[in-house]
């Protein structure tokens, strides 16, 4: 079984898919990375924690997770939280775990207060530490978004 999550970036007039998270069968659990540097110990990576969290409750086969990091560390954009949430979603799909959206949210909350935001497939307003979510009627259709990463570290821990 193989799973991957592709992020689609609008560049010019086209949309270009970039595989940002890939999960493949392996003899033992492993994490590999490419793209931007990810500081810290591998065991502290939220993708690793997401796998081990689900492994406590489900009989998961060993896998290799490959993460292509495109959101800068410390940007305050929830890059690690989104990686964790999408790992949960992808594992749920690949292993046919049939975890409900509500339970995925509960698992995500154990990984970080803003991880639940990335389980949702709609625009949400996050308040508190990011754990209180309210749907809002908003679309990015026909809008441009500019994201600026100043030369400062924004910790979301």
Map each language-model feature to its residues:
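Residue-level signal for inorganic ion chemistry
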Residues: 17-19, 47, 80, 147-148
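Solvent-exposed beta-strand sheet faces enriched in polar/charged residues
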Residues: 22, 32-34, 66-68, 107, ...
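A short glycine/serine-rich beta->alpha loop
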Residues: 32-41, 70-77
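Helix-rich "cap/lid" substructures immediately adjacent to catalytic or cofactor-binding pockets
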Residues: 43-71
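DPxDG-like acidic metal-binding loop motif
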Residues: 75-101, 117
């Amino acid at each position: 079984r193989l799973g991957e999550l592709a992020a689609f970036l609008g560049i010019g007039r086209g949309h270009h898919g970039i595989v940002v998270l890939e999960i493949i069968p392996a003899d033992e659990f492993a994490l590999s990375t490419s793209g931007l540097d990810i500081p810290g110990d591998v065991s502290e990576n939220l993708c690793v924690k997401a796998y081990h969290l689900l492994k406590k409750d489900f009989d998961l086969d060993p896998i290799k997770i490959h993460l292509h990091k495109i959101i800068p560390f410390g940007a305050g954009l929830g890059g690690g939280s989104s990686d964790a949430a999408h790992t949960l979603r992808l594992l749920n799909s690949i292993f046919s775990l049939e975890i409900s959206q509500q339970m995925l949210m509960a698992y995500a909350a154990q990984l970080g207060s803003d991880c639940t935001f990335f389980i949702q497939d709609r625009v949400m307003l996050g308040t508190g530490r990011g754990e209180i979510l309210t749907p809002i009627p908003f679309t990015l259709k026909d809008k441009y978004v500019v994201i600026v990463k100043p030369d400062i570290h924004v910790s979301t821990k």
